[in-house]
Amino acid sequence: MFLQIPATLIGGYTQSIVAVVFGMLTLLIVLFITNVSTGKLSNETIILAGIILSSFLSAIISLLVALTPREDVSNILYWTMACVAMRGWGQVHLIFPFFIVGTAMILFHYRELNNMALGEQSAQFTGMDVKRKKKIILIGASILTGGAVAVSGAIGFVGLVIPHLVRLLVGANHRYVLPFSLLIGGGYLILADVIARTVIAPSELPIGVVTA
């Protein structure tokens, strides 16, 4: 009985845990490439390494699709285009722990984000360990991303554009940018889901198509 309880709990979170673990693994590879190439965590190098790794992983997904039985291909393609159909409170419970941990890690470092927005050199003058804080923030973002992708698939545009729109509305202070991005991003996703469910009803578009 003692061993069965943890197994039961872990079993429900398997997909989310695997997604977070591989998200962290991807982050480690990006950081490794960045350190090997420049020796420092510059934003430009991190972005470039992320693009390179994203292309490589996309090729692996394409290979898996090619090797998948024909009857299962549609399910994989639908997931890669992102979908929240048939998702309910059960999935919310699965990602909630990852949401709390990742959000707390990022919100707690809003001051550091404000300092880094002025430039890494300026942030270092304040006595901040830029490299360490950047790693913590990236880990928090990986936890959030892994938990979300495990449930809905990769939904583009929202995480890329919404924070910039919020910054235009509330200013550059991350104390406000982060929570408002959370709220407005969620509202935008709900609106996109409504459009995806109604525009070609009774069929449904993948939500990733609408957001993009």
Region locations from a protein language model:
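Alpha-helical transmembrane segments in inner-membrane proteins
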Residues: 1-212
